[in-house]
Amino acid sequence: MKKIISKVFAGLLAITCLVGCGSTGTGTTSTTTDDGIKWDKEVDFLVVGYGLAGASAAVEASDIDPNAKILVIEKMSEELAGGNSIASGQTFVVPSKDDVETFHTYLKAMNEPNPIPEEYSSWLAQEYADQINWINATMENCGYEVGYVGGGPLRWGSLVVEFGNLPGADFKGTSAHIRKKDSGSFMAGGLWHGFNAAATQRENIEISYRTTCIDLIQDVETRAILGVVATTADGSTINIKANKGVLLACGGYENNLQMQRDFHGVDNVRTSGTPGNTGDGIQMLMKIGAQMWHMKNQTQSGGYWLGVAVPDFESTFILNMTFKSGSYLQVDAQGERFYNESKTYHRQHMKDLKYGKWLDLPHEEALPVWFIFDETLRAGDSVVSPWLSWPITTEHYAWSSDNSAEVEKGWILKADTIEELAEKMGYEPEAIRATIDRYNGMVDKGVDEDFGRDPETMTKIENGPFYAVEITPTLVATTGGAKRNTKSQVLDWNDEVIPNLYEAGELGSYVSNLYQNGVFLSEAIASGRAAAQTALGGKSTVTSEVTILEAGETANTSFFKDVKDGTYEVQITGQHGEFTLEVKVAQGKVSLIQVEDGADNMFMDEEQFAALVNSIREKQDLDVDTISGATQESQNVLDSIRDYFTK
């Protein structure tokens, strides 16, 4: 046996895994066992990768056996841990237990034309409905809470269904979120922070950072995975034995350009998620003969987001999805417009309905692509999203609301004339001038004759200076990996289990085609827990019933009931600057909310603001839905009012 294992280790498994492996710390004693391997550390359950799937698995394993030795090993530093879950939209989907079959129908429809086994999708739909009470209890125990992603408690019907033309799209569900207890509002990175808090408070979970997993160790006769080889932060190489199994929760290959070219067939694509996902788990899985699936797909429905790449960050920013000014357009490699720039593609994760199918936007084929705008947009709109992407959520870069800092850095090109701007972009000045002139002419006509852009979103590009930023096709994560069953066990090409090897999260996801917002983070939790349950032979009994209100139902509370009568000035720090609201309260009820100063800085129109105010007055509470098209700004208003009256 010694000879067989050593051959596997030295030859068959000589691959590099740069994702999610942890150091053992000081004082570790090495032992040599009957299998002929010198083990430097021995644990019961080893988790490779510390994102949402890995954290969920560790917490579930600790619930099952508080005495089990659980080691989570992570490639990134502690400050940059969390995987793509920390850079995501922070939503997980919860279907009603009474409507699981309808939701299952929707899941199956989204996975066409690349269906997964029906028993898999059926299991997933049921887990999404069942796991909410475990999540709720887990968060209650560590100072966090589950609520609606738009603020306040969960409410049926609050979920935005992205593909309403598919069978099952009328399922009953809600968009759930995790935030600090009693905060009542959206929390950036909330899911990750909540599960990180749950994991770090458990004494039998060890988390090691800045360590590299370089091999799986496998018994070639039984095919069982015995453990891993890792290099620690100080450069030492160690062998870690995992008696009950190894879970690979180390993400996809979005930061491996060669894999992108090989599997997606793209020339150039970047990521707005963690820079740590470079396909290392995929290499390990392929080396041991795991059956691979979904290698072309990614978590954003296969649609590429519009990224802004800058020299200072590995990951991209995300181009803003809406703008107050319409003085912008995008051009392709020939300097011409190539699609309708103003549609709400982000509501279908950057897909467009064409020929009766949800297809990718054409940016990858149109490269290079540039976003051109004028001084009006520059001064009034942030070019990038202020709440999405790794540089913002994790590396905490604050993009200036008027883009001035980024112009100064040279990230955004600036020129006094369109012709000068074209030269800086590398285009023929006549080509860009012709495109701008045609666009401006259609603004005068009140109709986009080329691509049907809503004239309400079109403003002349005429107020110099003029600006341009290059657009890079961007994704958050890939979903390819090994095929896994509902126990999160990795399968070979004969659909047989590879013993003691598990997989969860993005790596080998069940998402094979379209992606509904919230499905992926829900799967990370479900698959991570399934791996722990299989490896440790049990299931957590931790549970706490969560209250989910019916659509239109209130929580029978009034936020303003204890507020003294009076008129208050509430300062709002919005997406594009500060503005002041006048809030009048009489007899414990809010009677008026209006903009007193700084209306030009408010990133929502009058109709959207009126809808938000009406919701607050109708419920006499801040537990209201955010407004479509102004989600972040409505949340800023709700948070600021809440903070003002509770400080």
Where are these regions (language model features)?
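An anion/pyrophosphate-binding glycine-rich loop and adjacent beta-alpha core
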Residues: 282-284, 291-424
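Structured beta-strand/loop patches that form or line metal/cofactor-binding pockets in enzymes
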Residues: 450-480, 548-593, 597
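Conserved redox-cofactor binding core of oxidoreductases
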Residues: 126-236, 257-258, 305-307, 443-463
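Glycine-rich loop(s) and the adjacent beta-strand/alpha-helix scaffold that form part
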Residues: 233-309, 521, 527-530
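Active-site- and interface-proximal helix/loop "cap" or "latch" segments in soluble metabolic
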Residues: 559-647
